[in-house]
Amino acid sequence: EAEPHSRI
């Protein structure tokens, strides 16, 4: 599953 927030 993809995370709801974007990781930088």
UniProtKB/Swiss-Prot annotation:
GO terms for cellular component: extracellular region. One of its GO terms (molecular function) is lipid binding. Plasma. Also expressed in skin (at protein level). Signal peptide: none annotated. Keywords: Lipid-binding, Metal-binding, Protease inhibitor, Secreted, Serine protease inhibitor. It comes from the Eukaryota. It is found in: Secreted. Serum albumin, the main protein of plasma, has a good binding capacity for water, Ca(2+), Na(+), K(+), fatty acids, hormones, bilirubin and drugs. Its main function is the regulation of the colloidal osmotic pressure of blood. Inhibits trypsin but has no inhibitory effect on thrombin, chymotrypsin, elastase and subtilisin. Belongs to the ALB/AFP/VDB family. This is Serum albumin. It comes from Duttaphrynus melanostictus (Asian common toad).
